[in-house]
């Protein structure tokens, strides 16, 4: 039996908690004002019409309406809220 744990074994065994990032409301869904649309790191998706963003880059609806995704240009995705 070894009297030592082996090199590095006590330095391992940790992992961070999942951050639950991603799209929370998809295109065509009806949302209320204040609903979180996307949680992200950085500006992967840009806020469009009637969409605000928080200090952690969370996109949220400013008014009641329907979610619509489009492209601002070739590489920038944008989220809009369209009124009924």
UniProtKB/Swiss-Prot annotation:
- Mainly localized where? plastid
An example of a Gene Ontology BP annotation on this entry? translation
Q: Name one Pfam family in it.
A: Ribosomal_L27
Q: Does the keyword Ribosomal protein apply?
A: yes
A molecular function GO annotation: structural constituent of ribosome
Q: Which UniProt keywords apply?
A: Chloroplast, Plastid, Ribonucleoprotein, Ribosomal protein
Subcellular location per the Swiss-Prot or TrEMBL entry: Plastid, Chloroplast
Would the keyword Ribonucleoprotein turn up in this protein's UniProt record? yes
Protein family membership: Belongs to the bacterial ribosomal protein bL27 family.
For this entry, the protein name equals Large ribosomal subunit protein bL27c
> What gene, per UniProt, encodes this protein?
rpl27
What is one cellular component GO term in this UniProt entry? mitochondrial large ribosomal subunit
* Entry-linked InterPro entries: Ribosomal_bL27 (IPR001684), Ribosomal_bL27_CS (IPR018261)
Q: Which domain of life is it from?
A: Eukaryota
Q: Region Disordered: which residues? A: 1-23
């Amino acid at each position: 039996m070894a009297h030592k744990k082996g090199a590095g074994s006590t330095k391992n065994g940790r992992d961070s908690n999942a951050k639950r990032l991603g799209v929370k409301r998809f295109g065509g869904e009806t949302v209320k004002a204040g609903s979180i649309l996307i949680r992200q790191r950085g500006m992967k998706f840009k806020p469009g019409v009637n969409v605000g963003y928080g200090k952690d880059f969370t996109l949220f609806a400013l008014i009641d309406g329907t979610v619509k995704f489009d492209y601002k240009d070739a590489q920038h995705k944008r989220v809009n809220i369209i009124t009924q």
